[in-house]
């Protein structure tokens, strides 16, 4: 029983005996008897790396525990039964009164009796630590190691300094040569030789940066048949080189795993990677199209289109391919969304020209399809019909028009236009006549080609509509306030028929000023006297009062069917007393333009014409509304300086602080910002572009600060 107790760890079965504050220095003595267990023994009079040194008298420090509280004891006098070889777990019995100094129990042979005992797990740990401490550190004393221990009172031994020249010449990365078996080296050399021979056999010269064919993917067919033959020969040579050799089966495992994760089989992915020299993109393209190139049989035909940004390897794969009837790859899809290539240009041009001669059948054809196929340019686009606006940069007003036209088809006209829903038969008749007469007038701002004028449209009253529609459908103001109101109620009268507007605002502040369309360039009515269809256009002698002028340079701005961007902006004309006539040549140009491409269908009223107040003289410091070129909207600005030519001025946009040079015709007084609301009057009227008015407010909104740009 006693033996079992001695061999048991006291921390598991011991009873608390030592006071809690024995380590605090306040306890002066401990009254025995008591049994404590040795946890650790250390000779504090010798260095730790040589505790058995006899240079100084031995003084042992013992870590003792009663199973709950640990304390430290000092060998005050020599203990005969305790040494450094006494294992932890040994039990000692303290007799009498044990003096305590600064938390240390003072032990000697008179108050200490060794009972013995062996705690197995404590002894194993202790023996392991002792065996490891015997290992000497071999790098002591050499370069880079710790300095050797020098006993106190002795001088440091001088170590011979290492020659710096020897250090410079020493190779720090000297590796011991490992002799490999002869057979392994021979096999490696054979593989290496085979790989070199395979590369040399292909004799393929690498040209970086695209070589002489850089940019051929951007110019379809630019290389010609000669380039195709050269590339086919290179492809055949490359394919033959792939078909033999030691490493022909090796593929990039990472690329293989990437393709298999997309759902392709491992064998198909491996074959595709082998066919395209581990080019992941080319391999994916071949797998997506389902046509794997056969290396030995030469380049097969592949049904892929040439998109933007194609690599040369992909170009080689499709040299002899024919373009599919529909987009079959990602590149075909991107090609339809990005850039304007010649193929798509011809396709869209042919579609737009075919629409010139076909008549609309219903509202969907009149509205939605025209939005998809007509050219709605932005303000800075001013080329002919061979150039299109960016596909992804439609102004917000066009998007609103599409939504509004769809709303009209699904829900009917807005409820606020009750006066225009009086008779469905009148509406149908008006729509039919509207489609006949107005298709000679495209809605977009860009001037197209003036050279196409079908004779059939001349017979259908295209001349008449091409003159009336700019006044009616483009949101221009014509006549004074009373005349316009009268015109709304009397649709078939001959007083102001060509100058009324759809969804028009009557600004009473400018009753004496008359507005014109950007494309109206005639000053008399001689051309229109023999027009048969009075429903499409009516004019009388009062038409001569509405002299239309080109604000900037008159007829000289039109040349070869093109007009400069600045010349396209017109504004209100001086009062009736101003007499400026344009030439008959301008009239013919206008009609040719208006009949070049016909469109019909619901169109929202466009931004009212930018006003040029001809009689207004600007001075530096004047506040105004200036047109900003990017979004084609008016913002509050201040005139900073006027150009000596009298055509432009430098303005500072008040809310943004940036300076821009603006044409004087694109500057108007600050009072022109106000718009007056008009009541619900008028019936169905020509110039509505196939749809009743949706709003009495102009498309050009009031000033709203745009979002901050990055």
Curated annotation (Swiss-Prot):
**Cross-referenced CDD domains:** Tudor_TDRD3, UBA_TDRD3
Where is the protein found, in the record's own terms?
Cytoplasm; Nucleus
Return the GO cellular component terms, semicolon-separated. Answer: cytoplasm; nucleus
Per the record, where are the segments of Polar residues compositional bias?
453-471
Answer yes or no on keyword Cytoplasm: yes
Q: What does the annotation say about its assembly with partners?
A: Component of mRNA stress granules.
Domain comment from the record reads as follows:
The Tudor domain specifically recognizes and binds asymmetric dimethylation of histone H3 'Arg-17' (H3R17me2a) and histones H4 'Arg-3', 2 tags for epigenetic transcriptional activation.
Q: Please give the name of this protein.
A: Tudor domain-containing protein 3
Encoding gene per record? tdrd3
């Amino acid at each position: 029983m006693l033996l079992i107790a001695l061999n048991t760890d006291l921390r598991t079965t011991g009873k608390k005996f030592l006071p809690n504050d024995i380590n605090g220095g306040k306890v002066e003595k401990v009254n025995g008897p008591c049994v404590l267990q040795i946890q650790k023994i250390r000779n504090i009079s010798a260095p730790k790396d040589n505790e058995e040194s006899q240079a100084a008298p031995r003084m042992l420090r013992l870590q003792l525990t009663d199973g709950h509280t640990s304390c430290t004891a000092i060998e005050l006098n020599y203990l005969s039964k305790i040494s450094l070889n006494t294992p932890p777990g040994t039990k000692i019995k303290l007799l009498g009164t044990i003096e305590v100094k600064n938390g240390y129990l003072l032990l000697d042979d008179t108050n200490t009796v060794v009972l013995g005992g062996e705690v197995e797990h404590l002894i194993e740990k202790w023996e392991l630590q002792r065996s490891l401490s015997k290992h000497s550190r071999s790098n002591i004393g050499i370069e880079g190691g710790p300095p050797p221990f020098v006993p106190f009172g002795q001088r440091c031994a001088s170590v011979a300094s290492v020659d710096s020249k020897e250090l410079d010449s020493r190779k720090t990365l000297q590796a011991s040569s490992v002799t490999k078996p002869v057979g392994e080296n021979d096999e490696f050399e054979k593989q290496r030789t085979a790989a070199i021979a395979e590369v040399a056999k292909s004799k393929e010269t690498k040209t970086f940066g695209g070589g002489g064919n850089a940019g051929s993917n951007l110019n379809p067919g630019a290389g010609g048949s000669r380039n195709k033959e050269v590339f086919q020969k290179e492809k055949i040579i490359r394919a033959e080189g792939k078909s033999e050799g030691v490493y022909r089966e090796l593929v990039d495992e990472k690329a293989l795993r990437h393709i298999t994760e997309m759902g392709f089989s491992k064998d198909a992915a491996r074959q595709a990677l082998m066919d395209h020299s581990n080019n992941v993109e080319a391999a994916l393209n071949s797998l997506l199209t389902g046509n794997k190139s056969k290396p030995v049989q030469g380049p097969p035909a592949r049904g892929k289109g040439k998109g933007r940004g194609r690599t040369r390897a992909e170009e080689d794969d499709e040299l002899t391919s024919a373009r599919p009837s529909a987009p079959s790859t990602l590149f075909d899809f991107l090609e339809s969304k990005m850039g304007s290539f010649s193929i798509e240009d011809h396709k869209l041009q042919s579609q737009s020209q075919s629409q010139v001669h076909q008549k609309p059948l219903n509202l969907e054809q009149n509205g939605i399809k025209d939005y998809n196929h007509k050219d709605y340019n932005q303000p800075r686009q001013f080329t002919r019909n061979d150039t299109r606006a960016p596909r992804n940069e439609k102004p917000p007003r066009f998007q609103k028009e599409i939504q509004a036209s769809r709303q009209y088809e699904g829900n009917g006209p807005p409820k606020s236009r009750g006066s225009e829903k009086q008779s469905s038969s009148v509406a149908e008749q008006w729509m039919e006549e509207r489609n006949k007469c107005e298709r000679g007038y495209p809605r977009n701002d860009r001037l197209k080609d003036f050279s196409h004028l079908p004779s059939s449209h001349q017979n259908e009253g295209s001349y008449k509509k091409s003159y009336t529609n700019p006044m009616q459908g483009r949101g221009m103001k014509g006549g004074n306030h009373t005349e316009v109101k009268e015109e709304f109620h009397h649709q078939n009268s001959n007083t102001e028929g060509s100058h009324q507007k759809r969804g028009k605002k009557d600004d009473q502040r400018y009753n004496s000023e008359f507005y014109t369309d950007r494309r109206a360039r005639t000053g008399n009515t001689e051309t229109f006297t023999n027009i048969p269809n009075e429903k499409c256009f009516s004019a009388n002698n009062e038409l001569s009062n509405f002299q239309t002028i080109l604000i900037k340079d008159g007829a000289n701005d039109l040349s070869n069917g093109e007009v400069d961007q600045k010349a396209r902006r017109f504004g209100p004309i001086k009062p009736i007393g101003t007499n400026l006539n344009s030439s008959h040549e301008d009239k013919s140009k206008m009609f040719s333009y208006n009949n070049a491409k016909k469109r019909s269908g619901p169109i929202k009223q466009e931004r009212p014409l930018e006003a040029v107040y001809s009689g207004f003289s600007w001075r530096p410091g004047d506040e105004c509304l200036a047109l900003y070129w990017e979004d084609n909207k008016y913002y509050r600005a201040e005139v900073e300086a006027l150009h000596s030519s009298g055509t432009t001025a430098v303005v500072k946009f008040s809310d943004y602080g940036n300076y821009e040079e603006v044409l004087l015709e694109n500057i108007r007084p600050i009072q022109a910002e106000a718009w007056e609301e008009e009541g619900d009057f008028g019936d169905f009227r020509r110039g509505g572009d196939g749809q009743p008015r949706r709003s009495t407010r102009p498309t050009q909104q009031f000033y709203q600060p745009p979002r901050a740009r990055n």
